[in-house]
Regions:
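Histidine-centered metal-chelating micro-motifs
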Residues: 54-57, 75, 91, 95-101
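A generic "binding-loop/recognition-motif" signal
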Residues: 54, 62-63, 81, 97, ...
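Short acidic-glycine-tyrosine-enriched beta hairpin
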Residues: 81-95
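A short hydrophobic beta-strand segment most commonly corresponding to one strand
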Residues: 47, 92, 106-118
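Glycine- and acidic-residue-biased ligand/ion/polar-headgroup-sensing regions
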Residues: 63-74
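Conserved short histidine dyad/triad with adjacent acidic residue
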Residues: 30-32, 46-61, 95
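A short, N-terminal "cap"/entry segment at the start of jelly-roll beta-barrel domains
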Residues: 1-42
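Short, surface-exposed secondary-structure edge patches
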Residues: 47, 66, 81-83
Length: 118
């Protein structure tokens, strides 16, 4: 059976708790919007909130994932390359690719990430 999580504010959804992203500096939050708890065995959809001036951890995973920038601007590291992106831009992160999302400017960064379950 499907699930609906209604958006309550710019970074809150009904029935979805914010989770600290311990590997990242500066108060980054994750929100699992769709996952195993919702009956989704093959993928998960998460929202990341990155405060202005902060970033996600520089990391790599075996799986690939897709990212949609929802708000703010970011410097995205993909392997040895860096790209500036903004709201509406889409990023593909290949499996085992070193990556990081850094909020630029005075506005927080918000993005949706779709990936296989951990």
């Amino acid at each position: 059976m499907g699930t609906v999580h209604r958006r309550l504010s710019d970074r809150a959804w009904d029935g979805v708790a914010a989770q600290p992203y311990d590997d990242a500096p500066g108060g980054v939050e994750r929100h699992e919007l769709i996952g195993r708890a919702d009956g989704a065995p093959h993928y998960r959809v998460r929202y990341f909130h990155v405060p202005a001036g902060s970033r996600t951890a520089l990391e790599r995973h075996a799986h690939d994932h897709g990212v949609v920038i929802e708000r703010g601007r970011a410097r995205v590291t993909l392997g040895d390359d860096e790209h500036e992106v903004g709201a509406g831009d889409v990023v593909y992160v290949a499996g085992d690719e070193l990556h990081c999302f850094e909020a630029l400017g005075d506005e927080p960064l918000g993005f949706i990430c779709v990936a296989p379950p951990a």
